[in-house]
């Protein structure tokens, strides 16, 4: 039952398992410890998650067809926040791709770590800077040391970033290198906006 829940949701809380299994917290903890020793799950604070090897991240193409209307509304709101002469960072991602579609201003500079975003921006004749580095296949995001070095040399008026998950007090992404890039963006922006739909 525990592995079945993890298969559906990728993460499960201790509280939820106690209710589902109708058993004590200590019994659930023991079961989780046993499953972790068999590498079938990974214990996290307050519950468990699938081991990273089983958490396949959806590709940018798979994400781009989900929650279209919500992503469009988020992008419209984000575009309304951009001011004349802003230097903005637009992160790789499916929701941020909708922001690129909303951008019409030529009086801004857009920095991005997405090959696809850069092509669309150049087609719109919007001044564009693309971050180099290795490319993460599932998200088309530039990652690694080269990307970090470039980002750390720049400053942004506003940054619009995507995340894989949003939880109380923190954001998540399953890739450490991509996480490091997002952290650098946050540190180099005057204002940062996380563009995340309700599936996060």
Regions found by a protein language model. Name each.
Residues 1-22, 26-92, 100-109, 121-126:
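HTH-adjacent hinge/linker in prokaryotic transcriptional regulators
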Residues 94, 115-116:
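Alpha-helix/helix-capping structural signal
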């Amino acid at each position: 039952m525990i592995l079945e829940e993890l298969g559906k949701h990728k993460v499960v809380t201790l509280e939820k398992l106690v209710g589902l299994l109708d058993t004590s917290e200590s019994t659930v903890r023991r079961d989780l410890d046993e499953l972790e020793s068999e590498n079938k799950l990974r214990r996290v604070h307050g519950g468990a998650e699938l081991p990273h090897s089983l958490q396949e991240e959806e590709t940018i193409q798979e994400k781009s067809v989900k929650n279209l209307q919500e992503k469009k509304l988020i992008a419209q709101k984000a575009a309304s926040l951009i001011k004349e002469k802003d230097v903005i960072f637009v992160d790789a991602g499916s929701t941020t791709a909708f922001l690129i579609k909303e951008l019409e201003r030529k009086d801004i500079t857009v920095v991005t770590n997405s090959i696809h975003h850069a092509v669309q921006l150049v087609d719109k004749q919007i001044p564009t800077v693309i971050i180099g580095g290795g490319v993460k296949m599932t998200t088309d995001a530039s990652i690694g040391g080269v990307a970090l070095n470039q980002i750390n040399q720049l400053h942004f008026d506003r940054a619009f970033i995507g995340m894989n998950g949003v939880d109380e007090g923190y954001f998540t992404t399953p890739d450490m290198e991509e996480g490091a890039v997002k952290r650098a963006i946050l540190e180099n922006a005057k204002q940062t906006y996380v563009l995340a739909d309700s599936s996060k």
